[in-house]
Swiss-Prot record:
This is CLIP-associating protein 2. Residues 316-334, 453-467, 627-641 have a biased composition (Low complexity). The gene is CLASP2. The modification Phosphoserine is found at residues 8, 14, 316, 327, 330, 360, 368, 370, 407, 455, 459, 463, 478, 489, 507, 525, 529, 585, 587, 596, 621, 627, 892, 952, 955, 1013, 1029. InterPro entries: ARM-like, ARM-type_fold, CLASP_N_dom, TOG. Residues 60-311 are annotated as: TOG 1. It comes from Homo sapiens. Keywords: Cell cycle, Cell division, Cell membrane, Cell projection, Centromere, Chromosome, Cytoplasm, Cytoskeleton, Golgi apparatus, Kinetochore, Membrane, Microtubule, Mitosis, Phosphoprotein, Repeat. The lineage of its organism: Eukaryota, Metazoa, Chordata, Craniata, Vertebrata.
Length: 1294
């Protein structure tokens, strides 16, 4: 068909004037391309003139935009220089801010879109952070594409097209997001908008080959809008031309159904477009296309046949509708090039030098062909190397073999042929062979013959000429003779059906044909033949390791491993192993001439890089990636998905892809993402801070994944790897991780899933600091927002018990939260509904008692009497049972022969980890109680209880003395009970009585420095912190680190001072530089844990004021982080807040109003620490006015905070403060918010727990019903804490 005909055919149908109008203008992409980022198309989208959209002067009408305009606009932007990733991030943040707000002036938004292109031209894609910010730009680009200003829409479309052109498959996420919006532009009456949208979609289809785009296009093929349907089929046709088969396989059924609907479309032009797509479908899926054709009604079959005949593509029809066909070649050929085996002249046409611009698109590869001889490409290579050029279209004898042609990148710029309607160059048929098959050119310029070589099903094993599609002859003349003979004989059997299933095993050319085919299937046979499926097996490939992995610069879209000189000589090897490729060439040698031809065939086979599949890990043996029968180009094969390098084998860009899949709403994509994440983690690929944060958010949501069996199991496996690789960076997320895993232990899960949850808990326990885990568990236990089920309670208690066995005594922190948690555990020992909870709670108390006996004893002393009684009774029973158990086992040879000193078992350093291996007692704790009797134990324990209750705290002067006196022992010996306790293995008289042991324990209480006391009746900040009184380095050395003074060089504080100054400078950038300020806050949080006191002396006030000011920042994550830093400073240096208590309390309470839950949670945590850090009297005086005047939720937070403070106040002090406290609580009891009323009741209960019936006179204003409710809560608190005097009644009734 002549070029003129092509043009008129192109111009027939036009909706908005952007159909191709000429094949002459070359499609050039100015964007810089690296070899690792090709244009991702199987054939050059515009090798000799890409489709051009009609311009304003063309049929598009005024305002229409064509692709040439797009290409010019790609680089027609202001030049810009990128000096650092930080500068790039700032620029992208500003662009996003402008584009996300449609209130900005339209020209500002248009310039912002141009600036994105400027960044691309300047090489922004080389920076890792660019892809992270590109994800954030999705929404802004969509908003711009919806804009009412046509200029903004045009710039948005150009920018999207440029992103697709430069980034290729890396733009998959953005393309998926923007394509639906672009389709909405198609029916727009403004030509500039409609044509811009269409052009952008074309660019995306050409350069971004993402299977997820297919449903977006096919869904628009059934749109109510006629122009949208027409365009959609046109786009679908382009997609079928440009994409590799493996990218289409997943949606083959959708494509068939869509094309079928298009052929039945009510609109005539849409039907014409749909018929065009049939040819593309035929090239990729011949079987499905034939099935589709046969399912059509005769009238539609006839229309399709007529159309294909008129376009010269009758060879694409099924066998029944043409005179001859090949039962095999057409199945394997991607572009139905049936004429090639009979047409040697085409080789000359393709190899001869010409003026085509086929290589204008760097990195693109032509589609591979299935009918290439082993010798053909080698000959073409030799021919090319010798500089031979056959411009006449004829081929000299011996230069190339019959049927050979080079559909190669290397020779694609030497084509001498006709330009087809879509701009691709097709070879002309030369005169001597023109009559040799009645050749016709289809609408794309392909030459086809009606008569091609064909063999009968029964004769395949004896037909060596079929090997490599009957092209293995060394001269043109003999090749022509053979082809003519085969063609003539085949004419008589024009209706042979395609071979099915088992009939293919006998054909020696099956494997080789499949090997050179671009249809990525392990075996072309559809049925029971397993012979060829070996090609996809990973275990039968002896020479797989010739060359490890194709380098990343190979074509991503072709799905083929690249061959440096000749592409496709023995097939591109679509993920097929080296040995299979070798065997194909060797099998072809049966009919090859000896000598150089054979050597070249072997050499060519050996040149092909070995492929390596993406292997999943051992836990997924049922996955399709491990299946022998899996497709050679299945989803996880080497050339899978969007390119030759699997998604999960790329480094920087694939993390974003993996995270996107993990966050997908589709469970199968989440599973894929988890699999990819596992691969990254197994390869020790560490994630950046931003990636970690996002992954933690995704994982938090995954804990509630409804697809438990499918996704949650794999999530748990990935979680284990994630924790092991990033345990040092996940301490901020540990609360969520630990609490969610414990909650899952209480859920109804399959046994295998529950085992994985348990494994994740075990890994968590081993990976994080014990003290941090312990604090989180204490916090979780007392969290009033949680109502754990019985199973969850058991899980929490068992975890605490196991953790206690591996904790050091110093990890046991006697804080208010710990006391509250222990009191709750004591109440759980009487849980009426579950014996498991009762037993687990008892075990926890015993474990904590064993962990740090002095500290735990002090803690019990700070609890109300009812709690003490419950715990004392339990410990008494435990000691009695342990003693009896040891006595009964004394005669056993298995018992440890050397008894330990009684001081040893009472020592807090005797943790279960040291002792459990030395005893066989049921409790797994090692008590040396051979010489104890139960009466001694009971009396001694009673003495300890009395000592606790009568314990008197020393004065402030006495408190500071031990600090100096025992400076070297303070963080070791004295915390463990004095010098006598410093060595847990200290020997002693084995016959010491139990009374002596318990006396040691009681004396240990009195010898403890009181700054470690859990609760002082008179406020002392050192009771609530681990800091030392004199905040300077010399005192620090003298008090604690005399022996290690050299660890504190003199310039340490100076370095820290400079660092703090830098951090403060960064933090002063309010509402700007979000990422940098986050980093600064994290650094500041680390500094809070370092004891550089001189630095804090200098900068504390500035830090505090900046943090409080940051609480008003517009970024919620910054506000939450500031509260966390404040909490850490409170925790480590509470004494510094004495002069800033009121300001700190006010700002922390105000943060409870924040609309973001993350900020509120951080505020609650800060308030909780604040309540235990500053002076109770000072705190109450600040809180009382707030409770009386503030609105919800500030008053609620203040009441909760006051409740915590009251738990620390002595009876005498509370009596003095009661007149200030009560009015606010009485007022709150009448509040309209039920949560405020409830908080007031709890606070009153806390007051009653301290002062008892002295509260009664202050409750006179309460009504009878409120008094009754209050009494109920008081009695519940008393009974829950181990029993109380039943006559207690604040109302005076008994």
């Amino acid at each position: 068909m002549a070029m003129g005909d092509d043009k008129s055919f192109d111009d027939e149908e036009s909706v908005d004037g952007n159909r191709p109008s000429s094949a002459a203008s070359a499609f050039k992409v100015p964007a810089p391309k690296t070899s690792g980022n090709p244009a991702n198309s199987a054939r050059k989208p515009g090798s000799a003139g890409g489709p051009k959209v009609g311009g304003a002067s063309k049929e598009g009408g005024a305002g229409a935009v064509d692709e040439d305009d797009f290409i010019k606009a790609f680089t027609d932007v202001p030049s810009i220089q990128i000096y650092s990733s930080r500068e790039l991030e700032e620029t992208l943040n500003k662009i996003r801010e402008i584009l996300s707000d449609d209130k900005h002036d339209w020209d500002q938004r248009a310039n912002a879109l141009k600036k994105i292109r400027s960044l691309l031209v300047a090489g922004a894609a080389q920076y890792d952070c660019f892809f992270q910010h590109l994800r954030l730009l999705d929404g802004a680009l969509k908003l711009s594409a919806k804009d009412l200003r046509s200029q903004v829409v045009r710039e948005a479309c150009i920018t999207v097209a440029h992103l697709s052109t430069v980034l290729g498959n890396k733009f998959d996420h953005g393309a998926e997001a923007i394509v639906p919006t672009l389709f909405n532009l198609v029916p727009n009456s403004a030509k500039v908008m409609a044509t811009s949208g269409c052009a952008a979609i074309r660019f995306i289809i050409r350069h971004t080959h993402v299977p997820r785009l297919i449903p977006l296009i096919t869904s628009n093929c059934t749109s109510k809008s006629v122009p949208v349907r027409r365009r959609s089929f046109e786009f679908l046709d382009l997609l079928l031309q440009e994409w590799q088969t493996h990218s289409l396989e997943r949606h083959a059924a959708v494509l068939v159904e869509t094309i079928k609907k298009g052929i039945h479309d009510a609109d005539a032009e849409a039907r014409v477009e749909a018929r065009k797509t049939y040819m593309g479908l035929r090239n990729h899926f011949p079987g499905e296309a034939e099935t589709l054709y046969n399912s059509l009604e005769p009238s539609y079959q006839k229309s399709l046949q007529t159309y294909l005949k008129s376009s010269g593509s009758v060879a694409s029809l099924p066998q029944s509708d043409r005179s001859s066909s090949s039962s095999q070649e057409s199945l394997n050929r991607p572009f139905s090039s049936k004429w090639s085996t009979a047409n040697p002249s085409t080789v000359a046409g393709r190899v001869s030098a010409g003026s085509s611009k086929a290589s204008s698109l760097p990195g693109s590869l032509q589609r591979s062909r299935s009918d290439i001889d082993v010798n053909a490409a080698a000959g073409a290579k030799a021919h090319h190397a010798a500089g031979q050029s056959v411009r006449s279209g004829r081929l000299g004898a011996g230069a190339l073999n019959a049927g050979s042609y080079a559909s190669l990148e290397d020779t694609s710029d030497k084509l001498d042929g006709t330009a087809s309607e879509d701009g691709r160059v097709r070879a002309k048929l030369s005169a001597p062979l023109a009559g040799m098959g009645n050749a016709k050119a289809d609408s794309r310029g392909r030459s086809r013959t009606k008569m091609v070589s064909q063999s009968q099903p029964g004769s395949r094993s004896g037909s060596p000429g079929r090997v490599l599609t009957t092209t293995a002859l060394s001269t043109v003349s003999s090749g022509v003779q053979r082809v003519l003979v085969n063609s003539a004989s085949a004419q008589k059997r024009s209706k042979i059906p395609r071979s099915q299933g088992c009939s293919r095993e006998a054909s020696p050319s099956r494997l080789s044909v499949a090997r050179s085919s671009r249809i990525p299937r392990p075996s072309v046979s559809q049925g029971c033949s397993r012979e060829a499926s070996r090609e996809s097996s990973r275990d039968t490939s002896p020479v797989r390791s010739f060359q490890p992995l194709a380098s990343r610069h190979h074509s991503r879209s072709t799905g083929a491993l690249y061959a440096p000189e000749v592409y496709g000589a023995s097939g591109p090897g679509y993920g097929i192993s080296q040995s299979s490729r070798l065997s194909s060439s060797v099998s072809a040698m049966r009919v090859l001439n000896t000598g150089s031809d054979v050597e070249e065939a072997v050499a060519d086979a050996l040149k092909k890089p070995a492929r390596r599949r993406y292997e999943s890990y051992g836990m997924h043996s049922d996955d399709d990636a491990n299946s022998d029968a899996s497709s050679a180009c299945s989803e996880r094969s080497y050339s899978s998905r969007n390119g030759s390098i699997p998604t999960y084998m790329r480094q920087t860009e694939d993390v974003a892809e993996v995270l996107n899949r993990c966050a997908s709403s589709n469970w199968s994509e989440r599973k894929e993402g988890l699999l990819g994440l596992q691969n990254l983690l197994k390869n020790q690929r560490t994630l950046s801070r931003v990636e970690l944060k996002r992954l933690c958010e995704i994982f938090t949501r995954m804990f509630a994944d409804p697809h438990g069996k499918r996704v949650f199991s794999m999530f748990l496996e990935t979680l284990v790897d994630f924790i092991q690789v990033h345990k040092d960076d996940l301490q901020d997320w540990l609360f969520v991780l630990l609490t969610q895993l414990l909650k899952k232990m209480g859920a109804d899960l399959l046994g295998s899933v529950q085992a994985k949850v348990q494994k994740a808990l075990d890994v968590t326990r081993e990976s994080f600091p014990n003290d941090l885990q312990f604090n989180i568990l204490m916090r979780f236990t007392v969290d009033q927002t949680q109502t754990p089920s019985l199973k969850v309670k058991v899980a929490i208690l068992k975890y605490i018990e196991t953790l206690a066995k591996q904790m050091d005594p110093g990890d046991f922190i006697n804080s208010s939260e710990t006391r509250l948690a222990v009191s709750r555990v004591i109440t759980w020992t009487t849980e009426p509904k579950s014996s498991d909870v009762r037993k687990a709670a008892q075990s926890v108390l015993i474990s904590l008692f064993e962990l740090n006996t002095p500290e735990f004893t002090m803690l019990l002393g700070a609890l109300p009497k009812t709690f003490q009684d419950g715990a004392t009774k339990l410990l008494h029973n435990h000691l009695r049972n342990t003693g009896n158990g040891t006595q009964s086992s004394m005669g056993s040879p298995l018992t440890r022969p050397t008894p330990r000193s009684p001081a040893n078992w009472s020592s807090p350093l005797t943790s279960p980890t040291n002792t459990s291996q030395n005893t066989l007692s049921p409790s797994a704790f090692d008590y040396d109680t051979e010489n104890m009797n139960s009466e001694d134990i009971y009396s001694s324990l009673r003495g300890v209880t009395e000592a606790i209750q009568n314990f008197s705290f020393r004065s402030q002067e006495d408190m500071n003395e031990p600090l100096k006196r025992d400076s070297k022992k303070d963080d070791g010996d004295s915390m463990c009970g004095g010098p006598g306790m410093s060595d847990p293995r200290a020997g002693g008289d084995a016959t010491d009585s139990s009374q002596t042991a318990l006396d040691n324990k009681a004396s240990l209480l009195h010898s403890m420095p009181t700054h470690s006391s859990p609760r002082s009746r008179d406020y002392n900040p050192y009771n609530y912190s681990d800091s030392i009184s004199p905040f300077n380095k010399s005192a620090l050395k003298e008090a604690m680190f005399d022996d290690d003074a050299d660890q504190f060089p003199d310039d340490l504080s100076l370095d820290h001072s400079d660092l703090v100054a830098e951090l403060l400078k960064e933090l002063s950038n309010h509402n700007e530089r979000v990422e940098e300020r986050k980093i600064a806050l994290y650094e500041l949080m680390k500094l809070t844990q370092e004891e550089s006191f001189s630095v804090w002396d200098e900068h504390f006030k500035t830090i505090l004021l900046l943090l409080l000011e940051t609480l008003g920042d517009k970024e919620p994550t910054i506000r939450a982080l500031a509260l966390k830093v404040l909490r850490e400073i409170l925790r480590h240096q509470p004494a510094r807040f004495k002069n800033y208590a009121e300001l700190t309390v006010m700002k922390t309470l105000e943060a409870h109003k924040d609309p973001h839950k993350e900020v509120v949670r951080s505020a609650e945590e800060a308030a909780s620490v604040l309540a235990t850090s500053i002076s109770p009297e000072q705190c109450i005086k600040v809180l009382c006015p707030i409770i009386q005047t503030a609105d919800y939720p500030i008053n609620l937070a203040a009441i909760k905070m006051q409740t915590k403070v009251i738990e620390r106040v002595s009876k005498e002090t509370l009596n003095l403060l009661l007149p200030e406290i009560m009015p606010g609580l009485i007022q709150g009891y009448d509040n309209s918010e039920s949560s405020v009323r409830k908080a007031c009741v709890f606070c009153l209960v806390a007051v009653h727990a301290v002062i008892g019936d002295e509260l009664k006179p202050h409750l006179s204003q309460l009504t009878g019903s409120k008094m009754k409710l209050l009494n109920l809560y008081i009695k519940r608190a008393q009974t829950g804490s181990g029993g109380a005097d039943p006559t207690t009644d604040v109302s005076g009734q008994s």
